[in-house]
C-alpha cells in the first residue's frame, strides 16, 4: 500500500496531521499532490504544547513539514480492498503488451534492437576475399 494512494482515497474524509514542529491539524482532506502537499478544510490547529487552538476554514500544508498522518481505519480498509481486486499498484495482472517496440520477445538472445547479435553480421570490418593479399600486386 503506497502512501499517495492512501491519501487519494482519503479525500473528503477527516484526518489528523502532525508537523515536525509539533503542531497538529485536524480537518477534512480536500486534495493532495505527488509531493504530499495537502489542502485541508474545516481545520482546527493545536499548538505544540496543546494549550492553544485555532479554527481555520482552510489550510495548506507543505509535504516536507509533515511528521505523520492519522487516517480513519475505514480508509485503510478501502485501499486494501482495491489492492486485492488488482486495481492498485502491483496487484495480480494479466500479461499484456505494454509500450512500444518490436512486439516479440523482450530482452533475450539476439532478439532485441540493442548492441550485440550474431557476430560478423554488422557493419564491422569487411570480409577478406580469397586470392588477393593486402599490399602485394
UniProtKB/Swiss-Prot annotation:
<feature type="region of interest" description="Disordered">
    <location>
        <begin position="82"/>
        <end position="137"/>
    </location>
</feature>
<keyword id="KW-0007">Acetylation</keyword>
<dbReference type="GO" id="GO:0005634">
    <property type="term" value="C:nucleus"/>
</dbReference>
<feature type="compositionally biased region" description="Gly residues">
    <location>
        <begin position="100"/>
        <end position="123"/>
    </location>
</feature>
<dbReference type="InterPro" id="IPR010920">
    <property type="entry name" value="LSM_dom_sf"/>
</dbReference>
<dbReference type="InterPro" id="IPR047575">
    <property type="entry name" value="Sm"/>
</dbReference>
<dbReference type="Pfam" id="PF01423">
    <property type="entry name" value="LSM"/>
</dbReference>
<feature type="modified residue" description="N-acetylmethionine">
    <location>
        <position position="1"/>
    </location>
</feature>
<dbReference type="GO" id="GO:0005737">
    <property type="term" value="C:cytoplasm"/>
</dbReference>
<feature type="domain" description="Sm">
    <location>
        <begin position="2"/>
        <end position="75"/>
    </location>
</feature>
<dbReference type="GO" id="GO:0000398">
    <property type="term" value="P:mRNA splicing, via spliceosome"/>
</dbReference>
<dbReference type="InterPro" id="IPR027141">
    <property type="entry name" value="LSm4/Sm_D1/D3"/>
</dbReference>
<comment type="subunit">
    <text>Component of the precatalytic spliceosome (spliceosome B complex). Component of the U4/U6-U5 tri-snRNP complex, a building block of the precatalytic spliceosome (spliceosome B complex). The U4/U6-U5 tri-snRNP complex is composed of the U4, U6 and U5 snRNAs and at least PRPF3, PRPF4, PRPF6, PRPF8, PRPF31, SNRNP200, TXNL4A, SNRNP40, SNRPB, SNRPD1, SNRPD2, SNRPD3, SNRPE, SNRPF, SNRPG, DDX23, CD2BP2, PPIH, SNU13, EFTUD2, SART1 and USP39, plus LSM2, LSM3, LSM4, LSM5, LSM6, LSM7 and LSM8.</text>
</comment>
<dbReference type="GO" id="GO:0005681">
    <property type="term" value="C:spliceosomal complex"/>
</dbReference>
<dbReference type="GO" id="GO:0003723">
    <property type="term" value="F:RNA binding"/>
</dbReference>
<keyword id="KW-0687">Ribonucleoprotein</keyword>
<dbReference type="InterPro" id="IPR001163">
    <property type="entry name" value="Sm_dom_euk/arc"/>
</dbReference>
<dbReference type="GO" id="GO:0005654">
    <property type="term" value="C:nucleoplasm"/>
</dbReference>
<keyword id="KW-0747">Spliceosome</keyword>
<keyword id="KW-0508">mRNA splicing</keyword>
<keyword id="KW-0539">Nucleus</keyword>
<keyword id="KW-0694">RNA-binding</keyword>
<protein>
    <recommendedName>
        <fullName>U6 snRNA-associated Sm-like protein LSm4</fullName>
    </recommendedName>
</protein>
<comment type="similarity">
    <text>Belongs to the snRNP Sm proteins family.</text>
</comment>
<keyword id="KW-0507">mRNA processing</keyword>
<dbReference type="GO" id="GO:0046540">
    <property type="term" value="C:U4/U6 x U5 tri-snRNP complex"/>
</dbReference>
<dbReference type="GO" id="GO:0071005">
    <property type="term" value="C:U2-type precatalytic spliceosome"/>
</dbReference>
<dbReference type="GO" id="GO:0000956">
    <property type="term" value="P:nuclear-transcribed mRNA catabolic process"/>
</dbReference>
<comment type="function">
    <text>Plays a role in pre-mRNA splicing as component of the U4/U6-U5 tri-snRNP complex that is involved in spliceosome assembly, and as component of the precatalytic spliceosome (spliceosome B complex). The heptameric LSM2-8 complex binds specifically to the 3'-terminal U-tract of U6 snRNA.</text>
</comment>
<dbReference type="InterPro" id="IPR034101">
    <property type="entry name" value="Lsm4"/>
</dbReference>
Amino acid at each position: 500500500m503506497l502512501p499517495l494512494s492512501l491519501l487519494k482515497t482519503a479525500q473528503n474524509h477527516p484526518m489528523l496531521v502532525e508537523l515536525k514542529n509539533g503542531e497538529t491539524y485536524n480537518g477534512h482532506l480536500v486534495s493532495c499532490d505527488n509531493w504530499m502537499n495537502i489542502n485541508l478544510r474545516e481545520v482546527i490547529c493545536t499548538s505544540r504544547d496543546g494549550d492553544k487552538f485555532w479554527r481555520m476554514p482552510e489550510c495548506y500544508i507543505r509535504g516536507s513539514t509533515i511528521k505523520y498522518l492519522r487516517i480513519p481505519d475505514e480508509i485503510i480498509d478501502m485501499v486494501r480492498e482495491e489492492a486485492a481486486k488488482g486495481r492498485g499498484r502491483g496487484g495480480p495482472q494479466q500479461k499484456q503488451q505494454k509500450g512500444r517496440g518490436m512486439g516479440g520477445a523482450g530482452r533475450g538472445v539476439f532478439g532485441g534492437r540493442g548492441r550485440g547479435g550474431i557476430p560478423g553480421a554488422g557493419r564491422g570490418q569487411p570480409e577478406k576475399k580469397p586470392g588477393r593479399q593486402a599490399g602485394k600486386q
